[in-house]
Swiss-Prot record:
Region (Disordered): 1-32, 945-1018, 1033-1065, 1116-1230
Name of the protein in question: Myosin-1
Organism of derivation: Sclerotinia sclerotiorum (strain ATCC 18683 / 1980 / Ss-1) (White mold)
Presence of keyword Acyltransferase: no
Underlying gene: myoA
GO molecular function, one term: hydrolase activity
Region called Actin-binding, residue ranges: 403-485
InterPro entries noted in UniProt: Fungal_myosin-I_SH3 (IPR035535), Kinesin_motor_dom_sf (IPR036961), Myo1_CA (IPR054489), Myosin_head_motor_dom-like (IPR001609), Myosin_TH1 (IPR010926), MYSc_Myo1 (IPR036072), P-loop_NTPase (IPR027417), SH3-like_dom_sf (IPR036028)
PROSITE patterns: MYOSIN_MOTOR, SH3, TH1
Domain Myosin motor residues, every copy: 39-713
Length: 1230
């Protein structure tokens, strides 16, 4: 068996990744209950002791445990189980598809898979040589190989399927005509068959060819006790149709001499009736017409009736026919005259050397011999015709690329009486053994020596001497001696036998031992004694001219097809003998097999009783020895599993090295040997696993080759996956690009509608109303439904449901605003409302809290047609009134920040275009029914927001009335979002170019400016008043401040000395290169900035931080900074003594006036990560003031009036600044 596929990679069987420093994600081990425990060793190369006995013991263990297959490297050893083990089901067959030898248990399916895969992969012809003795299971193995190949060879068209069916149909057909029950095997092949399956370049079967060898035609006329004739005779006589029985006179097998002589009619395990139907079905599948089938069974009937012709000795001593009716019926079947049949059987035509033709009457033995010769000739030629007819149907229907041959030939035979047939059979087995020796033992060792490979020679027996003993011409071998004896005394068979025996006795060969009446040949399988009597006559293998004349006189066209050659009465040249034919066939077979890559199946018969439980160790040991399994094990353990020329090796595996291939092309410029070495190097094959010869690369273990094959298969898979991935990415780019274009188009189109609506707002105001800055922003769009009333979900949908707004009403505008409520006895005030406008009505919706629950209800629903006018002012305020003029209700006075947008939608929805907008200095509305009132609008710069009081609205000045909206601002530049993700498509869009706005694939955050060191920071001038004011903890009124005792202000303190630079307790590092973080926990760095390392990991990442934040950064980007030595502590001059209050005794004072100078600050600052001390607690009796220094003693002092005045001034300045900011913010408001 050659090399098969590597296993497919398991997608789930990948190493578990773990986080840095985390616990590895190791799966818990599970006990596999499905795996079958191995008995013995499945490969005999693994046995501890190499001996015939150890091999036999291992085979016995496996046989007892229903394991019949064992490997010797790539050779399969099969032990016949004599029972069905259920190991040839479709499920088992599927499990071997695409698997190599090491993945699955030994099986004949693995041999078939290997042969089929190697044929497709290496484009080499393959052959499977099945050897072993009769009954060891060769035919069954051949059928299983055909079953597997037919299943996996693919092809869905009708022609290929028909070819498969015909190939499988040849098994039952040829078994019926070529197999028989023997003492050693119930289904013994009595012929040899070499089936050559032909495949096209795609590995699909397109045809087949069958060559048959050594049909045992003597079985037609004679069998030993308890054996049977060929199966077809019993199938036909038991299962023939009534038409055949009437036309051909078919009776039960017991009625015919040829089927009843051995006394065995039935066989255990064989159903002749069922197999007869299988034979008929096989004939139909192969394409035999009904007429052809009729002629086949007519010839079978003729053979059966020929055997029933009996003779007796006449008065003249010659043979006469006992029953003329039998001859008459045979003449009817052969379509000849009965007289011609009697003449052909009872009259012998002799042709001496002088050319005179002599007709000699035959005696009874001679007549019976001629009768049997007639039957054998018909059956032999009928079998050849069937094989030729099958080949005609299996002719290749397309161009043939490669083939797989399956050799099924009966095995080595040793009987008590061995004659010419056994000599031919054993000779062919010797030739097959010679092939095995040459290919696995001799040729392998010779190749190692020729290629200069380091090798330990193994001793083995070369059976060439035995083959030469049988087939040699000079000196003459056994076949040549037979032919010479026939030439010397061709007319007398007994004289020929004696001449042949004399020649055998004169031979000198260690493997030949002459005896009295027989001779012994020491075959590789054992010593066999051959009987000389009749052996030369069988070697003649020529049909009497009388029988040939009989066939020539037949009026049946089919008989002329069986015997196409006309009889040449003048030809005296000796025809080829049977020995010549078998030698030519055997040599042709050897030539065919040597042109293919062989796979071997060595079959072993465990016992002679066909028992499924018996294991005869003695018999099996004998088979182990003559099959040479021990030598095969030794060579396999010491040899190389694979060898190939450098050119073919590189051609096969150059894809595996980046130095020999690029994009599938061969780019290596050196010689093929260095290329092969480069491939093995790049694939990490250990040097111990291969050797380089003179012309070939040798790989020791099959696992290595499996790995190379698997990597090659994965290469194509990966390339296909890469192309698919790029193609999918390309399609995704097109889809995304189209989506982006559509999105931008819709955005521009929809935005254009909103912008056009905004321009209509300018037209409605007629350039007479001042505008707010927000209303003129370029990004301002009139969206309309701000509350989402038209949405199906969200708060807007709940409002719609609460007011029972019909679904048919389209919401044009919605927002929140306020309404001016007038209550009796109270001033008017603003109340929040919800404004909703549809195509027909304007709704004012209220929200009330009732029993702690919000209730939403329609307060007013004003039809748009009822609105007579809308009144607004010329100022920038948001107030407007809806002039309804209802006699029962007042007009609503509303405020809404989106008033202009509301007017725009209202004008478009107003029926008849009757929208009347009044713009004046005041707002007009009916405060009470039919009672109009004017609301004045005045400009007040002190008002940040619109303020209503006493029928007057105070508002700030706005933008000029003729102001127009600013242009739409450009969007903020953002990084281009990649269309796809993955290694093959670069980020940044279809072009794959990174965006100018990105660093990597995300924007780099702006660096926060790092504060300058304290030592280099300039000290600002200190305000005398502000310098004495710490954090304000309480606002002190001016009156209370003025009531305090006056204290002169202290002199300004001297500027403090620059503090030393803080020394970090954590290591500082400088950033060498700019780094953009790729995830949330990665920290983006700017080149040159200083960071602090908080945590170091061994995986190349450190946890860093600075003023901008913290995160993980690569170690290689950082360089440690050596901190400088701390500067000397500088002392500042003492301030002059402060005049004024006497020394106070107490501990809570802010300063001690009697102390001449404050102590110097500490040399080291607190750590950067430490939080500052909390401010002092507020005091009830005044403001707490801290001096510039700190001391152990403290005092309490009352602020002076000048100090209070300075504090008040500072507070006013601060309040003014805050108001200015608030004013600016209010201006930005709606």
């Amino acid at each position: 068996m050659g090399i098969s596929r590597r296993p497919k990679a398991d997608k789930n069987a990948s190493a578990a990744d773990s986080a840095p420093g985390g616990k590895p994600n190791i799966q818990k081990a599970q006990f596999d209950t499905t795996k079958k425990k191995e008995v013995g060793v499945s490969d005999l190369t693994l046995i501890s002791k190499v001996s015939n006995e150890a091999i036999n013991e291992n085979l016995k263990k496996r046989f007892d445990n229903r394991e019949i297959y064992t490997y010797i490297g790539h050779v399969l050893v099969s032990v016949n189980p004599f029972r069905d083990l259920g190991i040839y089901t479709d499920a088992v067959l599927e499990s071997y598809k695409g698997k190599n030898r090491l993945e699955m248990p030994p099986h004949v399916f693995a041999v078939a898979e290997s042969a089929y895969y190697n044929m497709n992969a290496y484009k080499d012809n393959q052959c499977v040589i099945i050897s072993g003795e009769s009954g060891a299971g060769k035919t069954e193995a051949a059928k299983r190989i055909m079953q597997y190949i037919a299943n996996v060879s693919g092809g869905s068209n009708s022609s290929i399927q028909e070819t498969k069916e015909m190939v499988l149909a040849t098994n039952p057909l040829l078994e019926s005509f070529g197999n028989a029950k023997t003492l050693r095997n119930n289904n013994s092949s009595r012929f040899g068959k070499y089936l050559q399956l032909q495949f096209n370049a795609q590995g699909e079967p397109v045809g087949a060819d069958i060559t048959n060898y050594l049909l045992e035609k003597t079985r037609v006329v004679t069998q030993i006790k308890d054996e049977r004739n060929f199966h077809i005779f019993y199938q036909f006589t038991k299962g023939a149709s009534q038409a055949y029985r009437e036309s051909y006179g078919i009776q039960q097998p017991s009625q015919y001499l040829y089927t009843s002589k051995a006394g065995c009619f039935d066989v255990d395990g064989i159903d002749d009736l069922a197999e007869y139907q299988d034979t008929l079905q096989a004939m139909k599948v192969i394409g035999l017409s009904q007429a052809e089938q009729d002629e086949i069974f007519r010839m079978l009937a003729a053979i059966l009736w020929t055997g029933n012709i009996q003779f007796r000795e006449g008065d003249d001593g010659y043979a006469t026919v006992v029953d003329q009716s039998v001859v008459d019926f045979l003449a009817y079947l052969l379509d000849v005259d009965a007289a011609h049949v009697i003449q052909a059987i009872t009259i012998r035509i002799l042709t001496p050397r002088n050319g005179e033709v002599i007709e000699s009457p035959a005696n009874v033995p001679q007549a019976m011999a001629t009768r049997d010769a007639l039957a054998k000739a018909i059956y032999n030629n009928l079998f050849d015709w069937i094989v030729e007819r099958v080949n005609k149907s299996l002719t290749a229907r397309a161009e043939t690329s490669n083939s797989i041959g399956i050799l099924d030939i009966y095995g080595f035979e040793i009987f008590e009486q061995n004659s010419f047939e056994q000599l031919c059979i054993n000779y062919v087995n010797e030739k097959l053994q010679q092939i095995f020796i040459q290919l696995t033992l001799k040729t392998e060792q010779e190749e190692y020596a020729r290629e200069q490979i380091k090798w330990t020679p193994i001793k083995y027996f070369d059976n060439k001497i035995v083959c030469d003993l049988i087939e040699a011409i000079r000196p003459p071998g056994v076949f040549s001696a037979m032919k010479d004896a026939t030439k010397t005394a061709h007319a007398d068979p007994a004289a020929c036998d004696r001449t042949f025996m004399q020649a055998i006795s004169g031979m000198s060969n260690p493997h030949l031992t002459p005896r009295q009446g027989n001779f012994i040949i020491k075959h590789y399988a054992g010593d066999v004694s051959y009987t000389v009597e009749g052996i030369t006559d069988k070697n003649k293998d020529q049909l009497l001219k009388g029988l040939l004349n009989l066939f020539g006189q037949s009026r049946n066209h089919f008989i002329h097809e069986l015997f196409p050659h006309q009889v040449d009465q003048d030809n005296r040249k000796q025809p080829p003998s049977a020995g010549d034919k078998i030698k030519a066939s055997a040599n042709d077979l050897v030539t065919t097999l040597m042109k293919a890559t062989p796979s071997y199946i060595r079959t072993i018969k465990p016992n002679e009783n066909k028992s499924p439980t018996e294991y005869n160790e003695k018999n099996v040991l004998h088979q182990v020895k003559y099959l040479g399994l021990q030598e095969n094990v030794r060579i396999r353990r010491a040899g190389f599993a694979y060898r190939q020329t450098f050119d073919k090796f590189v051609e096969r595996f150059y894809l595996l090295s980046p130095k020999t291939s690029y994009a599938g092309d061969y780019i290596w410029t050196g010689d093929s040997k260095t290329g092969a070495m480069q491939i093995l190097k790049d694939t990490n094959i250990p040097v111990e696993e291969y050797q380089m010869g003179v012309t070939k690369a040798f790989i020791k273990a099959p696992e290595t080759l499996f790995a190379l094959e698997h990597m090659r298969d994965r290469y194509w898979h990966n390339m296909a996956a890469r192309i698919q991935r790029v193609w999918r990415a390309f399609l995704q780019i097109r889809i995304e690009a189209a989506t982006r274009i559509q999105r931008m188009f819709r955005k521009k189109r929809e935005g254009k509608e909103f912008l056009e609506l905004r321009e209509k707002g300018h037209q409605i105001l007629q350039g007479r109303k001042e505008r707010r800055r927000y209303s003129l922003l370029g990004s301002r769009r009139f969206m309309g439904d701000y509350l989402g009333i038209a949405a199906t979900t969200g708060p807007g949908s709940k409002i719609r449901g609460s007011i029972n707004l019909p679904a048919s009403e389209v919401t044009l505008f919605s927002c929140r605003g306020e309404i001016l409520e007038t209550k009796f006895g109270r001033s008017s005030k603003l109340s929040p409302r919800i404004f909703i406008m549809t195509r027909t009505k304007f709704y004012i919706v209220s929200q009330l809290l009732v029993n702690k629950q919000v209730q939403i209800a329609v307060e007013k629903a004003i039809p748009l047609g009822a609105i007579k006018f809308v009144s607004i002012s010329t100022c920038r305020d948001d107030w407007f009134s809806l002039g309804v003029g209802s006699p029962q209700e007042a007009d609503p006075l509303l405020t809404c920040v989106f008033k202009t947008e509301l007017f725009t939608h209202m004008q478009a929805a107003m029926p008849g275009g009757g929208f009347n907008l009044k713009i004046g200095d005041s707002i007009e509305y009916a405060k009470k029914p039919n009672k109009m009132q004017l609301i004045k609008v005045v400009k007040d710069s002190q008002q940040a927001q619109d303020h209503y009081k006493s029928a007057t609205i105070h508002t700030q000045a706005g933008e000029p009335p003729n102001s127009r909206s600013k242009p739409l601002p450009k969007g903020k530049p953002v990084a281009a979002k990649p269309f796809t993700s993955g290694r093959l498509i670069k980020p940044g869009g279809p072009g794959g170019r990174p965006s100018r706005l990105t660093n990597g694939n995300r924007p780099t955050p702006k660096p926060v400016p790092t504060p300058a060191p304290a030592a280099a920071r300039p000290v600002p001038a200190v305000n005398p008043v502000a310098a004495s004011i710490p954090v304000h903890t309480r606002n002190t009124s001016v009156q209370s401040t003025q009531s305090t005792r006056a204290v002169p202000p202290p002199p300004p303190p001297a500027p403090p000395a620059p503090p030393p630079a803080p020394v970090s307790k954590e290591p500082q590092y400088r950033v060498l290169y700019e780094f953009a973080g790729q995830s949330a926990n990665e920290f983006s760095l700017k080149q040159g900035e200083i960071v602090t390392v908080l945590q170091k990991e061994t995986n190349g990442w450190w946890l860093t931080k600075n003023v901008r934040g913290q995160g993980w950064a690569p170690t290689a980007y950082l360089e440690e900074v050596t901190p400088p030595p701390p500067p000397p502590v500088a002392t500042r001059p003492a301030p002059p003594p402060a005049p004024g209050p006497p020394k106070m005794n107490g501990t809570n004072g802010a300063a001690i006036r009697s102390k001449p100078t404050p102590p110097a600050p500490p040399a080291k600052r607190p750590a950067a990560g430490r939080k500052p001390a909390p401010p002092p607690a507020p005091r009830d009796s005044g403001m707490s003031i801290s001096s510039n220094g700190s001391g152990n003693n403290s005092g309490r002092s009352t602020p002076t009036p000048s100090l209070a005045g300075g504090l008040a001034e500072a507070l006013r300045a601060r309040q003014s600044a805050m108001q200015g900011n608030a004013k600016r913010e209010d201006e930005d408001d709606w």
